């Protein structure tokens, strides 16, 4: 009589380590960012003649979103920021990498870097404490003539540069998007 041999593998069960409040908050912020990028991509894809892609993880020096319209010879590199605070910062290196990307695509006549901001409908006022507010979105066109600096967008849609601790208002144009948004042209 033949016997069937089988092997048994014994694995040690790993119990997930409890996450600290800081780790939970970081994970939530990252998820909000990915969701906002994904929303932008889906909106472009539903629009005629547009194609859009999320380009990768934060560890890779790529813009968050690349959107192209070959019919209109247009390309956007988009840096997306989302949050519950009253301001959303954009580091200078992220603006610079978006500019580097659009400069490589000579075939497109219209090449723009967009800073896409989404202020969620809940405002964080303390750890785990939120207050309802209006959801707002802003799509600002980076002016290539400006010096590249860290900048911040406020809930009312104003953009400020931050250099050596000095805050200076930047007057960036709002981009009229080819899809429906929660954009506000004035607060």
Predicted regions located by residue number:
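Conserved catalytic cores of phosphodiester-cleaving nucleases, focusing on short active-site segments
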Residues: 44, 65-67, 74-84
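Domain-level recognition of nuclease-like catalytic cores that cleave nucleotide substrates
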Residues: 6, 27-32, 112-187
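Acidic-basic catalytic patches of nuclease active cores, encompassing PD-(D/E)XK
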Residues: 2-56
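Short, charged, amphipathic alpha-helix that recurs within catalytic cores of restriction-modification
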Residues: 86-115
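Short, solvent-exposed loop/turn segments that connect beta-strands within catalytic domains
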Residues: 70-74, 107-110, 123-125
């Amino acid at each position: 009589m033949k016997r069937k041999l089988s092997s048994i593998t014994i694995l040690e069960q790993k119990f997930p380590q409890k996450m600290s409040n800081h780790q939970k908050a970081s994970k939530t912020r990252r998820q909000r960012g990915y969701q906002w990028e994904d929303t932008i991509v889906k909106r472009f894809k539903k629009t005629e003649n547009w194609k859009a892609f999320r380009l990768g993880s934060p560890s890779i020096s790529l813009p968050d979103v690349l959107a192209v319209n070959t019919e209109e010879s247009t390309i956007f590199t988009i840096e997306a920021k989302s949050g519950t605070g009253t301001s959303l910062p954009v580091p200078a290196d992220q603006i610079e990498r978006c500019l580097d990307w659009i400069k490589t695509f000579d075939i497109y006549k219209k090449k723009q870097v967009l800073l896409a901001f989404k202020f969620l409908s809940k405002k964080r006022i303390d750890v785990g404490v939120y207050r309802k507010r209006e959801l707002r979105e802003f799509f600002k066109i980076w002016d290539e003539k400006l010096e590249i600096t860290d900048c911040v967008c406020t809930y009312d849609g104003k953009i400020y540069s931050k250099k050596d601790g000095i805050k200076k208002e930047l007057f960036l144009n709002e981009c009229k998007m080819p899809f429906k948004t929660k954009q506000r042209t004035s607060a």
